[in-house]
Each structure stands twice: as C-alpha cells, then as structure tokens.
Design a protein with these regions (language model features):
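FAD-binding core/adjacent interface of flavoenzyme oxidoreductases
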Residues: 1-13, 79-155
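Beta1-alpha1 glycine-rich phosphate/pyrophosphate-binding loop at the start
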Residues: 5-83
C-alpha cells in the first residue's frame, strides 16, 4: 500500500522533466497529462522554438508552400508546462536528480524522460562541410537559411 501512496503523491506533486522538446517529447508530455499527472512538468529543448513538424521543412517549406513558422505541431491538449527552450541540457546528475543546462542553471526532477531524437550525420570532411553552399536540413533555422539561399539564385 505504501507504493500506491508514493505513486499517487508523484502523480499529484511530482516533478517530471522531459529533455527533448520535439514530437516525441511533446506527445509524451501530453500523455502524462492525459493519464492524470498533475505535478510540475518541465520541457527542455535546445532549439528556441516550440515543437514543430520536421518533414515539411524539406518539402513544403523549400517549395514556398508553407512558411517555416506554420510547421508548429498541433497540441492534443494544454500542457501546463514550464518551457525551457533555446537552452541545451548538458549534464545529468542522477544521484541529485538534476539536469544541468547550458546557461548554468539546473532543473531538479523526480522522474526524467529523455526524448532528444537524432541529429544529421556530420559531413565526413570538416573543410568541405564549411564550404559555402553546403547545407544540413534538420531545423527550422536550417530551412530558413536554405530558403534564403535558394531565393538569392545562383552565384
């Protein structure tokens, strides 16, 4: 019975931190709320934007059919979350139950969900990767840079 009490206390008063504020992190946070979690929910994401849909970046956005700012993911429900966007999680202290952030602050948690996704594989030759006209397309900022370059026309 003590376990049931501690789970109920976590559900009501606990602190859950989600590292990764993209599709997986958003859907996990929504599910927590749908399943009755009423405690503190903190979303941490290294990009300064709320969760957005990535596939349109390489399709509709590049074709000019959809502006970058219209790729925000729809919400299934209100999250009542504390958003820490534009600041990367840099370290995890599991003993202290604390996530360190790039801005020097930290966030304490009772439960932690890591949903950071993946990154594009870097170009194998760093010198070539830095050449003018070489692009990676993963984020809204990447898409905006590429759209601007395409609009400028050939060089």
């Amino acid at each position: 019975m003590a376990l049931d009490g501690s789970l109920e206390r976590l559900r009501r008063e606990g602190r859950i931190v989600v590292v990764g504020a993209s599709l997986a992190g958003l859907r996990a946070a929504e599910t927590l709320r749908e399943e009755g979690f009423t405690g503190t929910l903190t979303m941490i994401g290294d990009e300064p934007y709320e969760p957005y849909d990535r596939p349109p970046l390489s399709k509709q956005v590049l074709l000019g059919l959809v502006p970058v700012d219209q790729t925000v993911l729809p919400r299934r429900r209100a999250l009542d979350a504390r958003w820490r966007l534009g600041v990367a999680a840099t370290a995890l202290d599991m003993a202290a139950k604390r996530v360190a952030l790039a801005d020097g602050t930290s966030v304490e948690y009772d439960r932690l969900l890591i949903a950071t996704g993946v990154r594009s594989r870097p170009w194998p030759n760093e010198l070539e990767a830095g050449l003018d006209g070489v692009f990676v397309l993963r984020t809204t900022d990447d898409a905006a840079r590429l759209v601007n370059r395409l609009r400028a026309g050939p060089r």
